[in-house]
Amino acid sequence: RDAQESRGLGDVYKRQTYNPAWRKGKEAFFATDGSDQSMIVMFAPEGCVINGVDSELYDWEKKLPRIEDLTDGMPPALQKLMGSREVKKMKSTFCVWTEDGITWYCNPMDGEDASKDLLPLIDGDPQTYVEYGKWFYPADLPLEAVRQLADGVPVTKELVAALNPKRSEWEEIKTGLDKIGYPNEL
């Protein structure tokens, strides 16, 4: 279920999806700008891998970076994540990974790779997300409401109304939040 829809932004704004049961013992977060840039963040007990692509950066048949080059030096357990059907379908123009959540690794490629556009979206700063939202939502997202979501504050009807006053499908929103394990008081 779409995490953003569950947070009250509506079907038309689906850009991000979180799946806490993506694979056995693994979670995934998917993000897209709706056109040429996409990212998948894969969480496993062995670490985390972020794969991203900008489909307009390369001639897909000739110059796309090879997965082997992007994952050179990556631990085998994390390399398996890069073999998922989602990554194969999406392709890759950048890949970063960590085993401990502190030190991140990448194999930089020549030229643009979309990382400067996509990685800031998951920097943990609510202001970054509010700025990102200006490109996609008809009204500015309220910083305080976004901050509450980032802090894990339980979703209430008041919080949903702050994000989108037109949403009132409480059971649908609650079901979506329950599915991804996000706390709520709906």
Q: Whereabouts are the PLM-identified features?
A:
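Short, solvent-exposed coil/turn segments at beta-strand boundaries
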Residues: 6, 24-25, 43-48, 100-101
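Short linear interaction motifs
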Residues: 11-34, 75
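Intrinsically disordered, low-complexity regions enriched in Ser/Pro/Gly/Gln/His and often acidic
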Residues: 15, 22-23, 90, 97, ...
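Aromatic- and glycine-enriched beta-alpha-beta binding-site module
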Residues: 28-92
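Surface-exposed beta-loop interaction hotspot
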Residues: 67-124
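A eukaryote-biased signal for long
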Residues: 103-186
